[in-house]
Amino acid sequence: GLLMSVFLFARIAFELSFDNFYHDSDNLYIVKTGWLKNGVLEGNESRFTIIPIPAAIAEEFPEQVESSTVSCSLFDNSFQLGERQLDLSTVMADTLYFSVLGLEMIEGNPQDLAGPDVVFLSAKSAKEAFGDENPIGKTLRYDFWGYQTTLLVKGIFADIPLNTSLERRPEAIISFPTIGRHLKWNLGWQSGGNYDGYLR
């Protein structure tokens, strides 16, 4: 009885702590999208959006929205370091990802995500890949959809706890220009609705 109560309280505490680790978490919002047909909402709203929507909301409501960011989960998570393969949960993100979500940077400048072939690693992933060596300036090979590129490690961020609403808890964050350059993805209003948008 007592042991079960301890487990139950621990689980409740974990559930109630979701997203509380974000800086000023009460002012962080996920952009949800509803699709209208003839003015009527079709189906359920989705947590996915198209790239320009969060920035357009921030521009339209400057007094309510301080900043916005967009990210996209990638399902090719295979990195090569010499002969070793690392499987890391990967997202691509823009330069405002860390400031909007309030994630802690250990080393590096989020503005580096404006350039191509850049990757930021979580502290745990950096340790897994490079041990006690400083990973900044080191390279990893990344394979996605038949393309290969060499990524330069330019930043380290604090590990994201398990109690997050993020669709994927990133262990590696790749810059949008990396994917856009190789795949020529449409990053505008015709980009499709597979992106996560956040407002602060």
Mark where each language-model region is:
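Residue-level marker for well-ordered alpha-helical positions
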Residues: I51-A55, M92, S99
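Generic hydrophobic, helix-prone segments enriched in Leu/Val/Ile
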Residues: F21, F61, F79-L81, T90, ...
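Mid-to-C-terminal secondary-structure elements
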Residues: D94-E107, V119-R200
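Short acidic/polar micro-motifs at solvent-exposed secondary-structure junctions
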Residues: G34-S46, T69-L96, I106-V118, Y142-L151, ...
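Generic structural signal for beta-strand residues in well-ordered domains
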Residues: L8, F21, D112, E133, ...
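Alpha-helical transmembrane segments of integral membrane proteins
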Residues: G1-M4
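Short, flexible, glycine/charge-rich loop motifs used to bind or transfer phosphoryl groups or to couple energy/partner
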Residues: F18-D19, A55-E59, L88, E107-P110, ...
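Membrane-proximal extracellular/periplasmic loop immediately following the first transmembrane helix
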Residues: F9-D76, Q190-R200
